[in-house]
Each structure stands twice: as structure tokens, then as C-alpha cells.
Design a protein with these regions (language model features):
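N-terminal binding-site loop/beta-alpha segment at the start of enzyme catalytic domains
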Residues: 1-76, 143
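A short acidic, helix-capping loop that chelates divalent metal ions and anchors anionic groups
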Residues: 15-21, 84-91, 184-185
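Beta/alpha (TIM)-barrel catalytic core signal, keyed to glycine-rich beta->alpha loops juxtaposed to Asp/Glu
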Residues: 125, 129-213
Length: 213
């Protein structure tokens, strides 16, 4: 039942809302039911991000684990860091600085009520990411046992190569946003049947390729 599942349960909808409201008993109950339903069908891997429901997706799951500590040795946890949600002026940003990534991971551990994250993903590409900052962040996280694997989200091969060279660690996963209307992961150069077309002749990942060479 609890063999490593090839499916991952996405928790973006758990927590009660994308706001600063506190967790409610109803949100915790709904998360517990979702958690139990996933386990019943053999899904033991759970995906989070520090921004999901303003952190409450992790917090509500942490409450479930407090009530069921025996599950900590059964499940695997994946979460993401690197995005700062838009402020009141509608301005959001990426932050792959060592300070932000380290603090984000530590905060996620606290919300999730666990001592280690099975896989920490950099949440979408940050065009301003710097090799020294990435190296410092992941060196600290691995050496202190706070994470077990490193991954990325929605990145191309050159971005992955850049991160691997910068950190000295292998990228173990790349979470992609895939749908019938989201196909840039498949073909980033030919806008077939696309009314908007692709205006740029630059291959995605050119910046990272140049930084590597």
C-alpha cells in the first residue's frame, strides 16, 4: 500500500484560501480527509510550495501530521521555494538568494512539522539567479540534513545545467506545468497554429547557456 507511488498529490487547494486568515478546524478536517484518501489509494508523496494558500497548505498538513505522527516515516514531502507573492501594489518577484532559499526551507519545515524535506524545488526560473548564492544555499541545506534532494520547477535544460554546475548537486526532478493550453515545455521555438506566434528568435535558456560558457 505504501510502496513509493509514481503519483504525487498536489496540495495547492488545501488550507482554506489565498489570504492571511488563520487555519480553521474545517480546513484541517478537509486536509485530513484528503490525506487519508490519498494514502488509501497508495499515494504517499505530497507536493507543496511555501506560497500555496499563503503558506497554509503546508501548515494544515503539519496539523494533520501532529495528529498522526506515525505517518512521518511513511510519506515523502516535496515543497518549493523562490517565489515572493505579489504585494498590495501587485508586484511579485523571484528570490533565489541564499538567505531567502535557506529561510524559506526552514519556515517550510516548521509549518510542515517535519525535520527534513525529501525534495526541495526551485519554484520556476529566476533570471537573476547567481551561482554563488545557489551554491551557498544548497550546501547549507544538504550539510545540515534539512533536505534530501534538489529539484526545479518549469525549467529548461540550460537552466538545469547552470544550477547543477553552480551547486555541485544533481537536479533530481523537474516539475512541469502541462496542459493542452500549456505546451511551451514541449516546443519553445515553433509557434505552430498559434495566433500570437513567437516574436523572439532566441532559444529559451540562452541566458543560462551564456552564463555557463
Amino acid at each position: 500500500m505504501f510502496a513509493n507511488s509514481r503519483l504525487i498529490y498536489g496540495t495547492m487547494g488545501l488550507g482554506g484560501g489565498w489570504n492571511s486568515d488563520k487555519l480553521t478546524p474545517k480546513a484541517v478536517e478537509e486536509a485530513a480527509l484528503a490525506f487519508e484518501a490519498a494514502l488509501e489509494i497508495g499515494i504517499d508523496y505530497f507536493d507543496f510550495a511555501d506560497i500555496y494558500q499563503n503558506g497554509k497548505s503546508e501548515s494544515v498538513f503539519g496539523e494533520v501530521l501532529k495528529a498522526n505522527p506515525e505517518f512521518k516515516n511513511i510519506i515523502k514531502i516535496q515543497t518549493k521555494a523562490g517565489i515572493i507573492l505579489a504585494n498590495k501594489d501587485g508586484i511579485g518577484q523571484f528570490d533565489f538568494s541564499a538567505k531567502h532559499i535557506i529561510n524559506a526551507a526552514i519556515d517550510s519545515l516548521s509549518r510542515l512539522n517535519v525535520s527534513s524535506i525529501d525534495s526541495l524545488l526551485l519554484h520556476r526560473p529566476d533570471p537573476l539567479m547567481e551561482a554563488s548564492e545557489l551554491k551557498e544555499a544548497f550546501k547549507y541545506l544538504f550539510e545540515n540534513g534539512l533536505i534530501k534532494k534538489m529539484g526545479v520547477s518549469n525549467m529548461n535544460q540550460y537552466q538545469i545545467q547552470y544550477i547543477e554546475k553552480a551547486t555541485g548537486f544533481k537536479v533530481k526532478s523537474n516539475q512541469l506545468q502541462i496542459s493542452l493550453s500549456k505546451l511551451d515545455w514541449l516546443d519553445g521555438t515553433i509557434g505552430v497554429n498559434n495566433d500570437n506566434g513567437y516574436r523572439s528568435t532566441f532559444t529559451p535558456g540562452l541566458l543560462e547557456y551564456m552564463m555557463l560558457h
